[in-house]
């Protein structure tokens, strides 16, 4: 996976690509000097030992534009194969899927994604008048998943954390965040971002993991307490503004820069980013 920052107008996209509608002039300035930065990321998967028909899929960046992220479009290619863009409606995710027939030497799928991003900050000292979230979205982000249940030991742990906590959801989420930071740790032996199997972590009392585990723990404990929360998977594309080498992309090749973080929702504040894994990880820089 390769990343390069680009500052020129993107060239015309092939008809098969998802074309963006955001002119570069829209990113010329940002409130408070929080400038937009534009990136191009190329992701390529090549199967070295194919057997029969090859199927490859790759995710694309966020489909819905945010105040910290805008999509500028995606292009893709899979020589000798058929490619289609698929939208997963439940979580509003986009995937490029390729099917390449047997006999193609080293079948491969390449996706080039262009997007703009800027620093994200939420002032939690007071409500900011954020618009109310769609109730269906909040309901979705209170639901259990296979690896993030909200009953049993997860709910018991959440209740124990909050038993003496008084205050609104912001105060309660902060207490959960601090518990995760105080009780979990980064385990370098865990592959990738981890599985995020929080029930097993709590049952075994093995609180070591990677970003996918530690942020999933925060999300599950929040959901069990009735606080909408979700984990977001992506990849780091820029250097850390604070000088943390392991918390930024320090080369053009970002194949190992995958990261998971979390966010939770509080009425009047909107979605608030949280990353206990990076809080813990700073001790390992």
Q: Locations of the language-model features?
A:
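N-terminal export signals
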Residues: 5-27
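Short beta-strand segments and strand-loop junctions that repeat across beta-rich extracellular domains
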Residues: 262-269
